[in-house]
Amino acid sequence: MTLEWFYATFVEMWSHTFMVRGFAVTILAASVCALLSCWLVLVGWSLMGDALSHAVVPGIVLAYIVGLPFSVGAFIAAIVCVALIAVVRNGSGLKEDTVMGVVFTTMLALGLVLISVFPSHIHLQHVIFGDLLGITQADLWQVVVLAPLAAVIVIVKRKDLTLFAFDPIHASAIGLSTKRLSALLLICLAMTVVVAMQAVGAILIVALLIIPGATAFC
């Protein structure tokens, strides 16, 4: 192991802009996912993160078709997914995990159909596994805005969210709106999914959203 090897392996790569962008997005995505993961595990919403990560695929495709930033389409698709889960769950009487499975697989299938019908530069592999080295300056700014925003919201409301996670009945009894806290947590989850999509894609988001909280819980 020589000094030249060390420089070429660990130092020279930072001279490339795409490496710096990829590293920055990875750090931001991993940090906000780990922060949110604790509440997701406590509330029992681990599958919700998986559902949203798959459900954003049609939003990404539609955003490209109409010329919007991918993050806008992904965020809207995530909110639509949450709304559909609530509507189907309340209207059918099915358990929440069953409804999640139905909704997110349907939206993922819709996204794959849209990719096939509207050929574009969107590669399915990049949607599923991310495109870390292809992150643009615009993508970086989207992550820089959304990741701290989600983190700040969770930190500011951490006491209310923790009480909601441990004892929603007590939270409601002392005047907290459990519906609003639930909606707030879902919005933060949607923003976090959009951030992580840039780095790891739809498949691996669930690992960033579950493993940190599960590790802390143990």
Model-derived regions, located:
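Membrane-interface helix termini and inter-helical loops of multi-pass transporters
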Residues: 4-16, 121-135
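Membrane-interfacial amphipathic/re-entrant helices at transmembrane-helix boundaries
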Residues: 1-31
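Transmembrane alpha-helical segments in multi-pass inner-membrane proteins
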Residues: 203-218
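Membrane-helix/interface signature in polytopic inner-membrane proteins
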Residues: 152-185
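Hydrophobic alpha-helical transmembrane segments
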Residues: 23-28, 71-76, 101-102, 140-145, ...
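Short loop segments and helix-boundary regions at transmembrane helix junctions
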Residues: 38-120, 217-218
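Mid-bilayer segments of alpha-helical transmembrane spans in multi-pass integral membrane proteins
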Residues: 83, 87, 105-120, 135-144, ...
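Generic alpha-helical transmembrane segments of integral inner-membrane proteins
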Residues: 27, 31-35, 76-84, 110, ...
